Amino acid sequence: MTTRARREREKEERRLSILQAAREVFLEKGFFRATMDDVAERAEVSKGTLYLYFESKETLLAHLLLEGLDALFAYLEEAFASDRPLTAEERLRRIGWAYLRFFQNEPHYFRFLMAANGERFRDAVTPELYQEILQASMEGLDLVVQAIEQGVREGVFHCRDPRQAAAILWALFNGVLELMSHPLRRDMIGVGTETLYRTALEAFLRGLRAPA
């Protein structure tokens, strides 16, 4: 291995080590309470070295968010694996349950998705990085849009604006999962997460169905 190749490998290993440290710190302290000093200490690097790799706490979150979006899309792709054509309702149900599995199996990534909401995050990262996150996010939303458009073409759904309907479904999923993340709210509602999630998804599908 050449000296240059070794340095590049060491640089990438350091970058990944810092991201792992940030992941641990953000989960332990919460993104908003965590500081760059905390991350540098956990990664065992100087603060100056940390800033050579990531210019802000939001930039660290952005890179973790990209990891999470990649993981989410893998769940969605797996959900669509089938040896026969899927109906529009089957597609939406599979998307819904894939998102729930993502929430259950990758709760840290779900928390990062929620932490990235807000004007401050958008303004704190570079336009290029923000566009990368936006593009990755759109891939998942587009799968929902395409399923709704399929239902409209087949006469199963009545919907004037599939993209707006997809946004509503996304808000519905996140609303249920965020609500049920809190023990007090779960106790208030008195049903399990999967039960409420299924009820919300089926209510959405009933609203989409074209009149008989």
List where the protein language model places each region:
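Short hydrophobic clusters on alpha-helical segments that form packing/core surfaces
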Residues: I18, A22-F26, G68, Y99, ...
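Basic, helix-initiating cap at the start of DNA-binding domains
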Residues: M1-K29, R33-R42, T59-A62, D83
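Hydrophobic alpha-helical connector segments
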Residues: H63, E78-H108, A166-L169
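Short secondary-structure transition hinges
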Residues: R101-Q146, R163-Q164, G190
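C-terminal peripheral helix-coil segments that are non-catalytic and often amphipathic
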Residues: M1-T2, A98-R101, M138-E154, A167, ...
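Membrane-interface starts of transmembrane alpha-helices
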Residues: H158, P162-A166
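Short, basic, alpha-helical segments at the C-terminal edge of helix-turn-helix-like DNA-binding modules
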Residues: L66-L72
